[in-house]
């Protein structure tokens, strides 16, 4: 287990998961239509944790594919929502699945890419920003390989002064987004606004005075 894997396993084991939200992300509800997902389309949720957003997507009629490093997160998701799953193990990857939900427990960088069938859309609420800068280019490449031509990504990022705190979540600039997805046909900024300070937001607790949240729609050519 490398340093990054140990870090995320420790967070879940100790219950330090303030990044997990109990409500469906309002930006997903507001902007999912911009993805133009076909009926019964496949949606990838990378680094999914136990996000309730996955359940919301399933209820919209989509087939959801989640990839998560920490098995505890997936087990909690299944138990908390009383989902009856089948199990499978392929190599180092463990699979929990139903007819419209397919959850993989593995390091996304080590997953055999052939195990993921092409998807119509990707929903990235907190995956890109969870990765240090040196890993982000490889992550983008992996996800784009799984995305069908013409498919879209709903991506959430944030910006803040990283001199005070290094993350995660990491600050990702619009310039990095433009560079990372330059091979795509369209990069559209759907929303950009200053975050309202909340007591449980650890960025503010570390002395960050300003955080800017952005929502992007990126279409693959």
From Swiss-Prot:
S-adenosyl-L-methionine binds at residues 12, 47, 68, 125. One of its GO terms (cellular component) is cytoplasm. CDD domains: AdoMet_MTases. HAMAP family: Thiopur_methtran. This is Thiopurine S-methyltransferase. The keyword Methyltransferase applies. GO terms for biological process: methylation; response to metal ion. It comes from the Bacteria. Its main location: cytoplasm.
């Amino acid at each position: 287990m490398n340093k990054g894997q140990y870090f995320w396993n420790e967070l879940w084991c100790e219950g330090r998961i303030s990044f997990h939200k109990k409500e469906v992300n309002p930006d997903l509800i507001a902007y999912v239509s911009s993805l133009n997902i076909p009926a019964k389309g496949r949606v990838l949720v990378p680094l999914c944790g136990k996000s309730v957003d996955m359940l919301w997507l399933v209820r919209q009629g989509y087939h959801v594919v989640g990839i998560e490093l920490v098995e505890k997160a997936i087990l909690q998701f299944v138990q908390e929502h009383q989902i009856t799953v089948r199990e499978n193990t392929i190599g180092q990857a463990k699979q929990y699945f139903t007819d419209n939900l397919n959850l993989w427990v593995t390091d996304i960088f080590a997953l055999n890419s052939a195990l993921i069938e092409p998807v119509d859309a990707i929903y990235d609420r907190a995956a890109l920003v969870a990765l240090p800068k040196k890993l982000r280019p490889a992550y983008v490449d992996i996800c784009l390989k799984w995305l069908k031509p013409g498919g879209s990504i709903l991506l959430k990022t944030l910006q803040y002064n990283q001199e005070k705190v290094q993350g995660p979540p990491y600050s990702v600039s619009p310039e990095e987004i433009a560079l990372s997805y330059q091979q795509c046909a369209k990069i559209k900024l759907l929303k950009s606004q200053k975050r309202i300070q909340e007591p449980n937001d650890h960025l503010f607790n570390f002395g960050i005075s300003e955080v800017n949240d952005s929502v992007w729609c990126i279409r693959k050519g």
